[in-house]
């Protein structure tokens, strides 16, 4: 039975990760660290312990103090340029907190790190967002977890709480394409709940050492891998 920790639990993918973790018979305890109380905590959950604070400088110490030590640390944490007030602030928040929390998990003795990244992530990208995501990935790989799992979904289909008009339009198109034929959608967009289940399944498999050959240290899942693992 695994004990896990999660940041990003109130986002579109993260909320589904939390739901999947709470329902999974192989997960004994779930600790979330967030700015807002996750929706799943509105009802009593025997497995769930939440830490809620707007002061993100407290998050790493909270993670370090968890008992038992989480076997798996999940991050689907992110923000937007608009919410952060510009890309420079977005970088400080998203890159800074992801790296800080991953380091705290590693130092505490966590074995598996599962990061929800993005398709096109590359430290060499000319696109600032993709470069940021790539830099987070590279720092995660260098931390030396027993297993690092990186998911690179395309467009994420689902309902967000915050307004992102262009993304909403693309999600509408993805939804229509999926109704015509799933293959028209799966190559470039994945449902949030499918991504979440893939993250949970991959994390638990990695904990057991059940990873593809050649991916013993770092396992990267693209769109087709996410679809396959998320529908198991």
From Swiss-Prot:
Give the way it sits in the membrane.
Peripheral membrane protein
Q: Name one GO biological process term.
A: import into nucleus
Q: Does the keyword Transit peptide apply?
A: yes
Start and end of the transit peptide?
Answer: 1-36
Location of the protein in the cell:
Mitochondrion outer membrane
UniProt lists the family membership as follows: Belongs to the FMP52 family.
Identification of the protein by name: Protein fmp52-1, mitochondrial
Organism, by scientific name, is Aspergillus terreus (strain NIH 2624 / FGSC A1156)
This protein's gene is called fmp521
């Amino acid at each position: 039975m695994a004990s896990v920790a999660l940041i990003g639990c109130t986002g579109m993918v993260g909320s589904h990760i939390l739901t999947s973790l709470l329902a999974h018979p192989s997960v004994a305890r779930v600790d979330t660290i967030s700015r807002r109380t996750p929706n799943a905590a509105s009802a009593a959950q025997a497995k769930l312990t939440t830490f809620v604070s707007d002061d993100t400088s407290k998050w790493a110490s909270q993670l370090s103090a968890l008992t038992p030590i989480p076997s798996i640390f999940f991050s689907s944490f992110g923000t937007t340029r608009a919410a952060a007030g510009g890309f420079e602030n977005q970088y400080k928040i998203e890159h800074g907190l992801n790296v800080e929390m991953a380091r705290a998990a590693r130092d505490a003795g966590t074995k598996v790190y599962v990061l929800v990244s993005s398709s096109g992530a590359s430290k060499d990208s000319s696109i600032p967002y993709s470069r940021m995501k790539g830099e987070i990935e590279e720092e995660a790989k260098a931390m030396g977890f027993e297993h690092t799992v990186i998911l690179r979904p395309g467009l994420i289909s689902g309902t967000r709480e915050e307004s992102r008009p262009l993304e909403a339009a693309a999600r509408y198109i993805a939804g229509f394409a999926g109704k015509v034929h799933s293959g028209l959608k799966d190559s470039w967009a994945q449902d949030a709940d499918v991504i979440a289940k893939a993250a949970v399944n991959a994390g638990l498999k990695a904990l057991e050492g059940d990873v593809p050959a050649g991916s013993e240290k770092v396992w990267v899942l693209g769109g087709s891998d996410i679809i396959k693992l998320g529908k198991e």
